[in-house]
């Protein structure tokens, strides 16, 4: 076996979390205790054999080695200088149907997982999604300004922010944002 003792647990955690979520476990605040109990049992260990999963990774080289092994085992790659432009292009396309930055992030996570790319950190993905969403919004605003007169734009805005008749007293815009 490549890993011995408690190192097997670290490698197993990396493998299971990457395969299940597309992220390395250090991207999470913690591991579910049920998962940890299952893995220690499956490996013939006791949960008390380790103080914590973080104690396995006092040495960063060990964590890197486990992450690399898990990526190779499940066929995932990291987002790098080659794949980042592809992700940016995908975000541009996905932003046309996204209703918010959070929605775009969720769509991009699926896109990455489908292509077997490790999901980057939240900040990286959020910054890229925010940029793509803003570009889409700016294109939509430019299209409206090209096709509608200032008077028509003002009338549409007035209607969108007007109170809707009926219960709740919401604006038309709030009503439109409410899921069915």
Segment roles from a protein language model:
Residues 1-180:
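Long amphipathic alpha-helical coiled-coil/heptad-repeat bundle
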């Amino acid at each position: 076996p490549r890993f011995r003792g408690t190192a097997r647990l670290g490698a197993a955690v990396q493998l299971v979390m990457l395969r299940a979520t597309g992220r390395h476990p250090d991207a999470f605040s913690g591991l579910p205790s049920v998962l940890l109990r299952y893995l220690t049992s499956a490996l013939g260990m006791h949960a008390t054999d380790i103080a914590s999963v973080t104690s396995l990774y006092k040495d960063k080289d060990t964590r890197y080695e486990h992450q690399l092994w898990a990526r190779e085992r499940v066929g995932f790659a990291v987002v790098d200088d080659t794949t980042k432009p592809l992700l940016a292009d995908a975000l541009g396309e996905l932003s046309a149907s996204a209703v918010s930055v959070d929605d775009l992030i969720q769509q991009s996570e699926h896109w990455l997982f489908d292509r077997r790319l490790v999901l980057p950190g939240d900040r990286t993905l959020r910054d890229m999604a925010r940029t793509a969403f803003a570009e889409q919004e700016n294109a939509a605003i430019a299209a409206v300004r090209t096709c509608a007169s200032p008077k028509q734009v003002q009338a549409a805005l007035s209607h969108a922010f007007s109170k809707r008749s009926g219960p709740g007293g919401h604006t038309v815009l709030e009503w439109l944002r409410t899921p069915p």
